[in-house]
Amino acid sequence: MSRIGKLPIKLPTTVEISHQSDATVQVINVKGKFGSLQRTLPEELKIEQIHNDNGSSLIVSFENQTRTNKSLQGLYRTLINNMVIGVTEQFVIILTLQGVGYRASVQGKSLVLNLGYSHPVEIDIPEGITVEVTQNTTLNIKACDKEQLGLFAAKVRAWRPPEPYKGKGILYKNEQILRKAGKSGKK
């Protein structure tokens, strides 16, 4: 049995969980104060909700303990746990823009970045993601869905990944860039 997969998921009182199952798949819905998330799970996955004095918790297990099911048990437990954390607290990724003239702003439903190109870069902000710009160079990106948040942050960062010679680019908070020395001239 997976070490992570056998741990129970603690449910806060503000979270509502419901799941329906068909012949081939089951769907779990998680609702909280920041929104609701939905995910399809395989039919052989068992989800038990246990109520006790400390509150309620979920236990994720497979009926048939094959090698692949043991590894997938930890995966699905973590995915459901991320859904619970997302609807109660939200996930945050902070990006910083480093470079002369690099600026960001939010205009309506799009993020506008000035990254040294001849034109500003406009990126549409997906549904469920909020972007706040502080000091024109720091982006606070928040979302309930951790997967969607990571994909959007990677999409923004892909426009100007950090380069090792001058250290310019879009960086995650606390990211260290390995700096390289430039060419040394003939002596």
Curated annotation (Swiss-Prot):
UniProt KW Plastid keyword: yes
Main location (coarse class): plastid
InterPro entries (UniProt xref): Ribosomal_uL6-like, Ribosomal_uL6-like_a/b-dom_sf, Ribosomal_uL6_a/b-dom, Ribosomal_uL6_bac-type, Ribosomal_uL6_CS
Localization terms from the record: Plastid, Chloroplast
Keywords attached to this entry: Chloroplast, Plastid, Ribonucleoprotein, Ribosomal protein, RNA-binding, rRNA-binding
GO biological processes: translation
Statement: the UniProt record of this protein carries the keyword Calcium: no
Signal peptide: none
GO MF annotation: an example: structural constituent of ribosome
Pfam families listed in its UniProt record: Ribosomal_L6
Cellular component GO terms held in the UniProt record: chloroplast; ribonucleoprotein complex; ribosome
Superkingdom in the source lineage: Eukaryota
SUPFAM superfamilies given in the database record: Ribosomal protein L6
Transmembrane segments: none
Subunit structure: Part of the 50S ribosomal subunit.
Role description: Binds 23S rRNA.
Family stated for the protein in its record: Belongs to the universal ribosomal protein uL6 family.
UniProt protein name: Large ribosomal subunit protein uL6c
Annotated organism of origin: Thalassiosira pseudonana (Marine diatom)
